Regions:
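N-terminal membrane-sensor/transducer module of prokaryotic signaling receptors
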Residues: 2-182
C-alpha cells in the first residue's frame, strides 16, 4: 500500500509540476531573445535572402520559440521584409503604434542609427497577442545588418523604475506605460 501511495504521489507531482512548468514557459525571455537576434545577425551576414526565408518559416525553431520571432525591416523604405504576421510584410514599420506611442518609428530610427551588427534594445508598450490584458511592456533587441534592420522582441511582466535608466532609448515608452497604468 505504501508503494502505491508513493507511486501516486510521484505521478501527481510529475503531472502538476509539468503543468506549472508549461505555464511558466509560455512566453519567451530576454535570455532567449538575445541569442536569437545574434543568430539572425549571423544568418543575414551569411545570406540575406535565405535568412529572410528562414525567419518567415514558423517551423524553424532557430528563429521562432514560444512567442519570440525574428522580424526584419528594409532600411531604405522602412517596410517589413519578414514578420510573424505575414499580413505586415510590405507594410511600413513606422505605422506600428500603441495609443500615442509611435514605437514603430522609434524602432526604425534606432536600428537605422545603430552601428553595423551591434545589438541595441528598444522598449515600448504593445498588446500581447491572444490576451485581453491591455498593454504590456515589450523590449526588442534590434540590429542593423547591411540593408536590413532585424529584431526580436520579448514581453516584460513589469517594468521597474530602476530599469528605466538601464535602457536609455526606452525611458519615454516606460513613462507612457506607467502613466497609462495610473
Amino acid at each position: 500500500m505504501g508503494k502505491n501511495l508513493l507511486a501516486c504521489a510521484v505521478a501527481a507531482y510529475a503531472l502538476f509540476g509539468s503543468i506549472g512548468s508549461a505555464k511558466a514557459e509560455e512566453f519567451g525571455t530576454s535570455a532567449q531573445a538575445r541569442p536569437m537576434i545574434q543568430r539572425a545577425i549571423d544568418a543575414l551576414k551569411a545570406n540575406e535572402g535565405d535568412a529572410i526565408k528562414a525567419f518567415g518559416d514558423k517551423n524553424n525553431d532557430q528563429f521562432h520559440v514560444l512567442d519570440l520571432y525574428v522580424f526584419c525591416i528594409n532600411l531604405a523604405d522602412g517596410k517589413f521584409t519578414s514578420q510573424l504576421d505575414q499580413s505586415l510584410v510590405g507594410t511600413s514599420a513606422e505605422d506600428l503604434r500603441f495609443g500615442d506611442d509611435q514605437y514603430g518609428k522609434r524602432i526604425l530610427s534606432t536600428v537605422r542609427g545603430a552601428p553595423e551588427g551591434k545589438i541595441i534594445s528598444v522598449a515600448y508598450n504593445a498588446l500581447r497577442p491572444g490576451t485581453n490584458s491591455g498593454a504590456v511592456p515589450k523590449v526588442s533587441f534590434v540590429a542593423r545588418v547591411g540593408k536590413q534592420g532585424s529584431g526580436v522582441g520579448y514581453y516584460r511582466q513589469k517594468l521597474q523604475p530602476s530599469q528605466l535608466d538601464e535602457l536609455p532609448p526606452t525611458r519615454e515608452a516606460a513613462r507612457l506605460f506607467e502613466r497609462d497604468r495610473s
